[in-house]
Amino acid sequence: MPEETQTQDQPMEEEEVETFAFQAEIAQLMSLIINTFYSNKEIFLRELISNSSDALDKIRYESLTDPSKLDSGKELHINIIPNKQDRTLTIVDTGIGMTKADLINNLGTIAKSGTKAFMEALQAGADISMIGQFGVGFYTAYLVAEKVTVITKHNDDEQYAWESSAGGSFTVRTDTGEPMGRGTKVILHLKEDQTEYMEERRIKEIVKKHSQFIGYPITLFVEKERDKEVSDDEAEEKEDKEEEKEKEEKGIDDKPEIEDVGSDEEEEEKKDGDKKKKKKIKEKYIDQEELNKTKPIWTRNPDDITNEEYGEFYKSLTNDWEEHLAVKHFSVEGQLEFRALLFVPRRAPFDLFENRKKKNNIKLYVRRVFIMDNCEELFPEYLNFIRGVVDSEDLPLNISREILQQSKILKVIRKNLVRKCLELFHELAEDKENYKKFYEQFSKNIKLGIHEDSQNRKKLSELLRYYTSASGDEMVSLKDYCTRMKENQKHIYFITGETKDQVANSAFVERLRKHGLEVIYMIEPIDEYCVQQLKEFEGKTLVSVTKEGLELPEDEEEKKKQEEKKTKFENLCKIMKDILEKKVEKVVVSNRLVTSPCCIVTSTYGWTANMERIIKAQALRDNSTMGYMAAKKHLEINPDHSIIETLRQKAEADKNDKSVKDLVILLYETALLSSGFSLEDPQTHANRIYRMIKLGLGIDEDDPTVDDTSAAVTEEMPPLEGDDDTSRMEEVD
C-alpha cells in the first residue's frame, strides 16, 4: 500500500526503528511453517479473521461500560483488500488495536503456553488447521506471505508498525502513515506462488467456508472495470493521465504539463458542449461487497424466526432441493454453553449407510467460527441423517481430532444433542402423516439406535412402528399393541421374515391367530438385530413365535389334553429323531400348529430361519459362527393332523417299514422350506418329489419309456416303498 511504503522510506532521524529477536520457540515455529509443505494453506485467512473478530469483541465489551471507547470509530467491521499491483492482501479491522507493548509481547517475544505443544503435535503429524487452539494462529500468515506488516492503533497509545520477513527478528516503529483511528491492519506481502489468494473468487470461497457466520460484516474491496461513455476529448484526457501515472512510477516529473492539459480540456468542454462525439472507455472503480450477509440464524430467538427463514437456511446449508421435514432449534446454558439448529431431511440419501463416505452433515462452529463439517464425535452413527449446525462457546478454536475424542465438553454436547433429537422425533410422532414419511425414510436408523444405544433404548423403542396380524395396512406402535393385549397374555409375540404376506401365512402364527392373539410382523433384516437387544417393552417380554418353548395362554383342560397328546406321540417322536439323527436336536409335539403337519423351530438363543438367511447372504460372513449358531433345529409335529396320525399308525404297525424313513425325511425337508430355511441338497429333495408325482400319476418305475437319465438318478435314491405298498402311499398323500 502506498502509505506504508512512504513510512518505510522515512529517514532514520524522524523515526526510531527497534529490532527484536523472536523468542526461540516462536522462531522455530515460524521456520516449521515456512519450510514445510501444507496443502490447506487457506486457513491463514480464517485465523486472521478470527483474530480480528476477537479484537472487535474486546472493544465492544469495553464500550459497554465506557461508550467513549468508540469515539475513535463507531463502526465495527473487517475489510479485506487485495492489491494485485503490490501483490499484497490486507485485512483491516476496527477492533481494540494493540499498544507498543502488546505488539512486542504478542507478536514475537513472549511465546504462548501452547507454542511448544503445538510444534510437538505438528511434528507428530497433526493438522496445521488446529494452530488457533494454541493461540499462535497469526503465524499462519507465513504460509502464504514472505513478509508481514502489522499497523495498529490502540486508544491508549500511538500508531505503530510491526514488520518481519521471518528471518529470526522483527522491527517495531512509530507509524506516521495514514491515521487509522483505532484497529489493526495486517498486510501480507504474498509469495510469488500464492497469488491465488488475491483472486476475488478464492477469497469469497474461503470466507464462505470458514468465516461465513462471524458476527461483524466482512467486506471485500475489489478493483473492477466498467464501461463509461465520454466525449473524445475526455477519453484523450484519461489516456494522458494514465501516461502521466506511468511516468510518475518510472520517476519522470511532468506535473506542470498535466495541469495545462487539464485546464485546456475544461475550456474546450465549455466551448464545444455536447458537440463532441461520444466514446466508450474502461473506468476502474473499487467494488465493495459484504461476504457474510447470511447472519447466524441459530443465534437468534427461535420465536422470531419464520418457517420460510428456516427453510432458506436449510437449503443453503445442505443444497437440498426439498424442504426439511422437521427442525429443532435450541440453546443450552449453564456450566456449558452451546446453540444448535438441527434439521430432519424429507428423504434419506441413497448412501446413508455407506461407511467409507465421509459424512459432513453437522457443521461445528466455535463462537461462530467454522471448525469442521465431519465431526463424527458429535452424533452416534444411527443419527447420521441429521443435518444442521452446532455452535459452542466452550470448545477451543480449531480443536484437533485427538482432543475431540477426549473432550468432556464434547461428550456433554453429544448427550444433549441426542436427547434433543429424540424429543424432536417424539414431537414428530404426534403428527401421524408426517411421522409416516419420517418412518419410511429413517426406520432403519431408529432400529440401529436400539441395537447400539443402550441408554436411549427405551425412548427409541417407543418410536418403532410395525404391521401386526390385527393392524391391517396401518403400522402400530408397541404401546398400541400393549393396549390391545388379552387379559391373561404375558408376552408380546412377534415373527421375523421377508415379507408381510410370507409371515402372515406362516405355520408359526396359526394357533395364535386362532386364539385371537396379535402377532407383530417384523419384515426388515435389521429387525433381527433390533430384537436381540430389545428384550422387553413396558414389562412385557418379546417372544419369537419361531423359537422353541412358546408359551401360549391356556386353561387347565387344554394343558391336560396337550399332555395326553405328548404321551400318545412319544414313540413317533423317538422314531423320527432316530431317522433324522443329527439333522435335528429333538422332535416334539407342537402347541402352535393348526393346519400344518409340522414345522422347524430354533433354540431360544440360536438364529431364526430369517437370521440364517441374512447371515448367509453376507459376502464377508464368518463361516465359523454358522456351525454353532445355525444348527439348533427342533422339529415340531402337529398331533391333530391326519398325515402325522397316519404316520404314527404306520410306524407302530411296522417299525422297519422302509416308506416311513422316506416320508419322515420328506416331511422334514418340506418343513424346512415352509419354515424359511434353505435345503442343503435341493436336488435330492426334488427327486423325492418327482417320485411322489410319478406314484400319484400311476407311472411304473420300470416303464421303459422313462428317460434314461432320470432312471439313473432314481437308482441312487432310496426306494419310496414296494409296489404292494402303493395304495397305502397314495392314501398318505
Curated annotation (Swiss-Prot):
Identify the stretch(es) annotated as Interaction with NR3C1.
Answer: 9-236, 272-617
Q: Where is this region: Required for homodimerization?
A: 683-733
Pfam families from the xrefs?
HATPase_c_3, HSP90
Q: Where is this region: Essential for interaction with SMYD3, TSC1 and STIP1/HOP?
A: 729-733
Provide the residue span(s) of the region labelled Essential for interaction with SGTA and TTC1.
730-733
Does the UniProt entry include the keyword RNA-binding?
Answer: no
Which residues does the record list as Phosphoserine (modified residue)? S231, S263, S454, S477, S642
Residues found modified as S-nitrosocysteine: C599
List the GO cellular component terms. cytoplasm; melanosome; mitochondrion; nucleus; plasma membrane
Biological processes per GO annotation: activation of innate immune response; cellular response to virus; positive regulation of defense response to virus by host; positive regulation of interferon-beta production; positive regulation of nitric oxide biosynthetic process; regulation of apoptotic process; response to antibiotic; response to cold
Interaction with NR1D1: annotated span: 629-732
Alphabetized PANTHER family for the sequence? HEAT SHOCK PROTEIN 90 FAMILY MEMBER
Question: What's this protein's name?
Answer: Heat shock protein HSP 90-alpha
Native organism: Cricetulus griseus
